[in-house]
Amino acid sequence: MYLQSSFRKSILTLLAGVSLASVVVFAVVPHSIHAQNRMAFSAVSSSSGHVALGLALRKLSVSGTFLQAPAHPDDETNALFTLFGYGMGLRVIDVQNNRGDGGQNEIGPELFRDIAVLRTSELESAHRIDGAEQYFTRAIDYGYSFDPEEVIGKWGRKDIVGDYVRLWRTLRPDVIVTMNIQGRGGDRAHEATTVLVRESFRAAGNPAMYPEQIGEGLRPWQPKKLYFAGGAPGGGGGGRGGGQTGAEAAKLTPVNTGAYDELLGRTYADIGNDAHSNHKCQGVGGLGGGFGGGRGGGGGPAGAAAGRGAPAGADGPPGAARGGGFPGGGRGYTLVDTTISGQLQKEEASLLDGVDTSLTGIAQYAGPNPPRALTIGLAAILTDARTAQKAFAEGSDSGTAAPVEAGLAAVRALRAQLGGLALSEPARYEVDFRLRLKERDYQDAVLAAHDVTFDALADDGLVVAGQPVQLLLTATNHGASDVAVTGVEIAGFEEPGNCALGPAGKGAAYTCNAQAHVPKDAKPTTPYFSDNYWKHPENQAIQIFEPGVPFGVPFAPTPFRVTFHLKAGSAEVTRELPIENRYVKDLYFGDKRMELNVVPAFSVRLAPTLAVIPAASVGGAAKAVEREVHVTVTNGMKSAAKANVTLEAPAGWKVTPASVQIALTHEDESLSARFQVTAPLQPKLGDYTLRAVVTSPETGDRKFTDGYLEIEYPHVQRRQVIEPAEIALKVVDVKTVPNVNVGYIVGVGDQVPPAIEQLGAKLTYIDQDELAWGDLSKHDVIVTGVRAYERRPDLRAYNRRLLDYVERGGTVIVQYNKMEFNREDYGPYPAKVSGNRVSDETVPVKVLVPGDPVFNFPNKIGPNAWTGWVQERGLYFLGDKDPKYIDLVSMVDSFKDNPGEKLGSMVEARYGKGKWIYLGLGLWRQLPAGTDGAYRLLANLIALPKAPAQAAPARKTNGELHR
C-alpha cells in the first residue's frame, strides 16, 4: 500500500518524533534503570499530535522488553521493532555484536574506524523511525570469515559473552531474537554471534557467572525466551541461510509484520523498510532478504486486515495489531531455549506466548503470593490506562489527560509504597525497575495528552572551550488547557543563565533566552570508542571502551542538555533533551540538526595522510625524493586569529620553509600552508612520522596538534573524529617508472588515486565529457575505481570507448565490482563477477604466469610482496569467463567452508593491441593501510605500458595450454 507523498512524509516525521519516547540510553549504574539518561535522535525536538498520543497510550497497559541481537548493522529486522514497539507498546532494543568496522563503503571513503562511526550513525537514523534503543558489545568486525571458531577466538569468548551478560543484566529483556546458527552461507561472524548470544542466555541468570558484575551492583537476570531467526522452507530469509523444512518448518513461530496499523496508516513492514533503508553505506534500499526475513520489513501484506482495530490480547492496547500466524504476512522463528516449562514442546502463535507482558503481570516478580497492595495498585494503574485508551478510541484526545495524570500519580504512589510492602529486596528491585519504566511512559503520555513539545537550540554547533553560547529553550503548548514551566535546568556549561519561569497558555509557547559558557577545560568531541580504536589488545579484535561512558551506547550522551519541569493539569512531569544546533549545510542536505560538538580552537589537518617514498626509480641517477605537504588550519574561534604553522620532521629529513604564518579572519575559515618535505638521499626502509604544530598569540603557549574528520551525509547526524595532525612517512622497497600518465575513473570511496600519485605517476581524473568524446590515447593506462560500474552511469554508457582504447594499444585496469558488472559484457569478452573471495590475508598466492611483466617490471613480485596484508586478499573475483581471459594468480583460502582453488582475482585479457585487467585483489584496502607489497604491485600495474615487449601470457589448465 502506498500513501500520498505528503501524508507519507508526515507519518515519518511523526514517527521520528515519537521514537524519542523509546530511544533511551541507560547507563550501567547499580540499582537504577537510568531512565533520565535520554538521547534524542529525532529531527524534531519532541513528538506531538494524535498519532504520538495513540502510541504513547499503547505503552501504558503493558510491561515487557523485546530485544534483537544481530551481528552487524543491517542484520536487524526493523519491522520487528515497529511491531513490538509501536504495535504492542513494548520496549524494543537492538544489541549489535559490532559496528561493521570491516565492511565496504558504497557511499564514501570511510573504512575501519570511520565506517564504524558511519554505520553506528546509520543505526541511529534507522531507530529514529523504528523506535528501538541501540547498544553494542566491544567486538570489532575485523573482516569476513568462513570459520565461526576463528571469529570467537579473535573476539575472545569470555569477553563477549560477558558483554552480552552485562547488557542482559542491565536491560532485563524478556524475549531475545538472534540469528540462525544453522546458516552455512555468508560471513560466519553471524554464526559466531549466535553461539555467544546462546551461551549468554543462561549465564546472565547465574550469579556465579561474571561475579565481578555482581560486585559492581548489577543483578542476575534470566531472560524468558531465546529464538533463532528461521527461514522459509528451502532457505529464504533465515538470517542469511538457515532455511528449515518439514517438521522443523512446522514448529516455526510465525510473526506477521505485514499487519496494517490503522493509527499509523501503514504496515509494520513498510515502516521497517523505511528504517532499514538508512543503511546506505551498505547499498541497502529497504528491500531484500536478511535477519529473519526481509531485513527491514520481514513480511508482506498478506493477512494485513486481520490486525485492523483488533484488541492485542490480554491487557494489551486496543487498536493495535497482534503479531501472530498470518499466512504469508511475516517470517518464522525457532524457540531454542526458554525458562517457561513445557514451552519448547508447544506450537506457538507468537514470540510472546507464555510471557506475561500485561501491566498487572509486574506482580509476578513479587513471587507466587504478591502483596495485595501491589496487585490493587497495579490494577488501579491499569484502570487509568484503559480509561485513557477508551477516550482516545472514542475520538476525545483531550479526554485522555485526566486518566493519564491519575495513572502517573498511581505509579508514583505505588513506588513510594514498595519499601513498606512484604517484598524481598530482589523482588522489590524487579518491581521497581518496571515501575520506573512505567513512570517514564506515563510522563510521556501526559505530555502527549496535553500536546506539549520542547526544543533546545544553541546559536552554534561547533564550539570551542570557553566559548559563550546563546540558548533558546522552548516549551510549546498545542493542547486545550494551560500548562506551566516550573523549572529549567541547563547542564554541561559553566555559568548557565537563569530562566524565568511561567505559564504556557493553550496555543502559546514558553521561551527562555539564556547565555552559557562552554567549560574552559572541555575536551574536543569524539566517539568514545575512537581514541583507543587502534590500541586493542594484541591478537584480539575487541575495543577498549572509554571509562565513564554508559556501556555499549552508540555514542556518549552529550553533556550539553536541558531539563524542563512542567505542571500539566494535576501532574508534575519532566522532559530532558540535548541542546542542538540547527543549520543548513547546503541545499542538498537541507535543514539539519546536530548536538553541540567541541572542536579545537585551531583544527589542524594534513594531506596526504600517508606519504610513500619509493626507494628507487628505473633509470637516472639517485636523487632525494620530495613530497609536498599541505597543512590546513581551521579557525574554531569567533574572532580573527593569527597562527604559526610548523612541521616536526624525523632526523635527517628537511622541511621547507621552516614555518608559515597565516591570518584567519573569521570563524570556520580554513587556510592551507604548503611545505616541501625532502627525504634523505638514501633513507632507510621503514615508517616515520611527520607532525604539524600550530601556535597562536591568541591562545598563549598552547600547541594545537589535532584536527577532526567530519563524517556527515544527508541521512545521518554529523559526527566528528579527533585525529592527530600527522603524516605517516613510509619508505618502501619499490621501484617506479618515470613519466607514466594514468587516467582515473573514480568509483566509490576511492583512496587509490593518492597512492598512484605517491608512486610518481601523473594522475588525471576522467570526467563524463572526456569519457564520452575526449582523447583517451593520451593516457598510458586507465584505471577504474572500486565499483565504478555501479557508481558511474557514464562508464556503463561509454564502456565501448574503453574497449576501443584497449584495442588500439591501451591498458585498462578494472578494480573490483559487484553484480552490477554482470548487467552487460563490459569486458572485451564474456565474463561474470562472482561472490568468490579469499578472507585469510596470509594465505600463499600462487603466481600462474611468472613471466608476465606485472610480476617482473619494474619490481620483482616474490613471496614477500604478499606479506603484511590486512583483513583479506580480495573479493568479488571474476567467475565464469571466456577462455581468452588468463588468470595470473590463484589462492586457496584457509577456511574449510571456502574450499577449492580461487581464480579470478587477477585476470588479464589481450584485446587488439592492448591489455584489459580485472583486479579483485583488495589494493583499495591495502594501499591506505600502507601495505608494502600492494605498492610494488600497483607500481608494476601502472608501468605495464612501459614494460619490455612480451608475448601473450600462457598457462596450463587441465592439461590444455591457454594463450
What residues fall within each predicted segment?
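Bacterial N-terminal signal peptides
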Residues: 13-29
